Regions:
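Short acidic N-proximal helix/loop "leader" segments that mark the beginning
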Residues: 1-10
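Short, surface-exposed coil-to-beta transition loops
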Residues: 12, 59-63, 92-96
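A short, structured loop/turn motif at beta-sheet edges
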Residues: 21-22, 66-71, 100-109
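Hydrophobic pocket/interface hotspot
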Residues: 24, 28, 34, 51, ...
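Short beta-edge strand/loop motif at the mouth of beta-sheet-based domains
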Residues: 32-64, 73, 152-163, 171-180
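Short, solvent-exposed secondary-structure boundary/capping segments
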Residues: 72-79
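Beta-strand/loop substructures that line and gate deep hydrophobic ligand-binding cavities in soluble
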Residues: 81-131
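A conserved amphipathic terminal alpha-helix motif
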Residues: 120-171
Length: 180
């Protein structure tokens, strides 16, 4: 089956984080840093290097670093066709670009763009619609990691529970208790 990859998908985010460009680079462009705020990561930290994110039991994403310009710009591609159980020629790679811009006052803005091309199938739109809000908690993690634990090894802990109260109030209470 021949497909035309002419439907563009693109998400853009911007987050201000504490730290120098070098500290932010260590967090976003090294296996140790990404493992601390995003997902357990294996990475050859160079252009052309391989990349693997562990997303859970028996689930991961493989990719390649396509641009490496410390401490300013990182680009990597992932095979989102494989993630979705599709044929590789059905989709372009999922490309993520991180740009670090120093700001006054000891902060940086991190601009993140995720993009790719597909065929316009309904499941593709659903994938991209779900991807957008999925990034947001990770940006909170990045901000907290750089504010309280820059350069330290860390791992994520996911705890789930049902609570009948207001989610915002509960989250605020939890953050205050953890001094975050």
């Amino acid at each position: 089956m021949s497909t035309t990859l002419n439907v563009p998908y693109r998400l853009e985010f911007s987050v201000e984080v504490p730290g120098t460009p070098e500290q932010v680079w260590q967090a976003i462009a090294t296996a140790k840093g990404m493992s601390a705020w995003f997902a357990p990561t294996e990475m050859e930290e160079r252009e052309g290097g391989s990349l693997h994110f562990t997303m859970g039991p028996e689930m991961g994403s493989d990719g390649q670093v396509t641009a490496w310009d410390p401490p300013r710009r990182l680009v990597y591609e992932e095979d989102w066709a494989a993630l979705m159980g599709k044929e590789p020629d059905e989709l372009s790679p999922l490309t993520s670009e991180f740009i670090v811009e120093a700001q006054s006052g000891g902060t940086c803005v991190v601009r993140v763009t995720s993009s790719g091309f597909g065929t316009g199938a309904a499941w593709e739109s659903e994938f991209w619609d779900d991807l957008a809000p999925g990034w947001l908690p990770f940006f909170d993690n990045l901000r907290l990691y750089l504010a309280h634990f820059p350069g330290q090894e860390a791992t994520q802990l996911e705890v789930t529970a049902s609570h009948p109260g207001d989610a915002e109030a509960l989250w605020s209470t939890l953050r205050d208790a953890l001094v975050l």
